[in-house]
């Protein structure tokens, strides 16, 4: 009996040991898988860092040309550059939180400044937009504002390499931006003087889509259906924007967009935002 008990105990210990080995193997596989995902997230974030650097570099170059047009009193050239140069900034807007106080200096609207009782501090592209499109003049104040804009654009460009960009900021920033497009920008409040809102919308969508494209390989391993749903909704939004392309590679005035199409666009962006908000699954 004692011998049998000893044999049973030995067998139990052997099974337990094998079980522990299997458990260790499973833990090892999970750990390697987690390390793999972390490496992919790091690589995607690094690629987005590079993308943001490129956009801000082009933004600075474009701003230099824009300011030169202001200095030369070239209203037509300044207006031609305005929406196109801003697209570089708008593509970077998912991570504008990382820009600190340079974001409001460059991109604040008068309505926002009034709400905060800071209208005397108003500066940036939208202040110059008002001068060009509503006041229809370039004066010494406009030129001074242009120089300040260039100074801020240079500072942002210099800061680009030190921006604290994380997967969480990228994901949350893209969702928040599209929500802003669908709920407030769609009213035309962003480009209230120039009505070049469609350029902004396109750039915002491109910025969010860049984030999706970079994380797509990771997402497809976790949830292929969700990834396909996001892609389908991006396609729908872009199709609606394409409807208002002009013959010069730009976009029609937002004033030409019908109420029906504004609603359709807002609905499409909302429909995109819903699955996009679930992309955080890649960090789990």
From Swiss-Prot:
Lipid-attached positions, S-diacylglycerol cysteine: 18
InterPro entries the UniProt entry points to: EfeM/EfeO_iron_uptake (IPR050894), Imelysin-like (IPR018976), Imelysin-like_EfeO/Algp7 (IPR034981), Imelysin_sf (IPR038352), Iron_uptake_EfeM/EfeO (IPR053377)
Record membrane topology: Lipid-anchor
Cell membrane keyword on record: yes
Signal peptide start and end residues: 1-17
Gene3D superfamilies noted in UniProt: M75 peptidase, HXXE motif (1.20.1420.20)
Superkingdom classification of source: Bacteria
CDD domains (UniProt xref): Imelysin-like_EfeO
GO cellular component terms given for this protein: plasma membrane
Lipid modification (N-palmitoyl cysteine), residues: 18
Alphabetically ordered keywords of this record: Cell membrane, Lipoprotein, Membrane, Palmitate, Signal
Subcellular localization: Cell membrane
Family: Belongs to the EfeM/EfeO family.
Name this polypeptide is given: Efem/EfeO family lipoprotein
